[in-house]
Amino acid sequence: MNQPWRTHLQTKLKQLHEQGQYRNLHVTEQAEETWLIRDEKRMLNLASNNYLGLAGDERLKEAAIVCTRKYGTGATASRLVVGNYSLYEEVERSICNWKGTEKALVVNSGFTANVGAISSLACRHDIVFSDKLNHASIVDGIILSGAEHKRYRHNDLNHLEALLKTASPEKRKLIVTDTVFSMDGDTAHLRELVQLKEKYGAIIIVDEAHASGIYGIGGAGLSHIEKDLAQKIDIHMGTFSKALGCYGAYLTGDAIYIEYLQNMMRSFIFTTALPPSTLGAVQKAIEIVQEDHKRRENLIANGEYFRSKLREAGFNIGNSSTHIVPIVVGSNENTLRFSKRLQEAGIAAIAIRPPTVPVHSSRIRFAVTSQHTIADLKWAIDRITHIAKEEELFV
């Protein structure tokens, strides 16, 4: 191997070890279930994004099998060549009906959706205003676009407005935000963001990755809690890989935006389409989340219970108001130690460290699902509290 490269890589890996930021892969089985197997140990699954328990649903499995038998295992090409199966058209129509939008585009992942959409829409003559805690894919899309990047303090509307006020009136403006923040479990102030968008002549993109299938009318997303609000969002992004239990993502909004992305988005143009099996499962999942109110109600209730009990026990869970509940520890060292003890006790509790979260805010990110019982959550809370006291971390 080239020696300068070897030296550089070894130095970087050593730094990651020293900073407590080195990452390993762990073999996991049955991750679609409430209890999983990780490194051959049975654990309560409080780490996955399978929020509605659909990843193991027999109806989705059957839909995927039917489409595999009919269409084969691969799309064979990009959608703009010969990979645009009729399944794509069906799923995109379902998304438009679900979200109340004109046109939709199915893409390969939430990451490629954000990177591709933002870098296609914005250029060096534009300004993008982004919440400081937005997902890495949003940040990378802005960097790739070459646009001026204005980060506003998390959920700080006054700071955002100050930045909008001082922006050149000649420049196009784009505001982008997560709706449910993936590492904090709090939510964006969408109505106020839309008001600022309209006041300063911007457009807005919302990332519904952790809200699609859960919140709003028919689980259409946080922006659909109020119908008139959703109609004022320019572009909605959401994923099929979390609450819907599948894989892939969508972009939807007014036809002109989606037509533009279809023609300009490099992460859409230059990639092989999703396999037919995935599209079959996605179509079934969209049907289920609109009809199965009980799953969504269970998830919201479980989130409320878990948050309230952790707060009562004295844990710092920030401003979480959803099914994503962090316990903020602080240092990498203490977070890794806490995570190790929890896993030894039978809880899949994963340490989240920089650069995923800001420095000095390392945490355990818990995610409850609709399939957890109150007994499951109580069992976990008892062990979390006991271990935290033993380790003298915070309680």
Curated annotation (Swiss-Prot):
Task: Specify which residues bind substrate according to the UniProt entry for this protein.
Answer: 23, 135, 356
**EC number per UniProt:** 2.3.1.47
Q: Name one GO biological process term.
A: biotin biosynthetic process
Cite the entry's keywords alphabetically. Answer: Biotin biosynthesis, Pyridoxal phosphate, Transferase
- Residues noted as binding pyridoxal 5'-phosphate in the record, renumbered to the chain: 110-111, 182, 207-210, 239-242
Query: Where in the sequence is N6-(pyridoxal phosphate)lysine found?
Result: 242
Q: Which cofactor does it need?
A: pyridoxal 5'-phosphate
Superkingdom, taxonomy of origin: Bacteria
Matches recorded under InterPro entries: Aminotrans_II_pyridoxalP_BS, Aminotransferase_I/II_large, AON_synthase_class-II, AONS_Archaea/Proteobacteria, PyrdxlP-dep_Trfase, PyrdxlP-dep_Trfase_major, PyrdxlP-dep_Trfase_small
Q: Which reaction does it catalyse?
A: 6-carboxyhexanoyl-[ACP] + L-alanine + H(+) = (8S)-8-amino-7-oxononanoate + holo-[ACP] + CO2
GO terms for molecular function, please? 8-amino-7-oxononanoate synthase activity; pyridoxal phosphate binding
The metabolic or biological pathway listed in the UniProt record of this protein is: Cofactor biosynthesis; biotin biosynthesis
List, alphabetically, the Pfam families matched.
Aminotran_1_2 (PF00155)
Top EC category:
transferase
Q: How is this protein organized at the quaternary level? A: Homodimer.
What family classification does the UniProt entry report for this protein? Belongs to the class-II pyridoxal-phosphate-dependent aminotransferase family. BioF subfamily.
Q: Describe the task this protein carries out.
A: Catalyzes the decarboxylative condensation of pimeloyl-[acyl-carrier protein] and L-alanine to produce 8-amino-7-oxononanoate (AON), [acyl-carrier protein], and carbon dioxide.
**NCBIfam families linked:** bioF
Which PANTHER family does UniProt cross-reference here?
Answer: 8-AMINO-7-OXONONANOATE SYNTHASE, CLASS II AMINOTRANSFERASE/8-AMINO-7-OXONONANOATE SYNTHASE
Kindly provide the name given to this protein in its UniProt entry: Putative 8-amino-7-oxononanoate synthase
Please give the organism. Answer: Bacillus anthracis
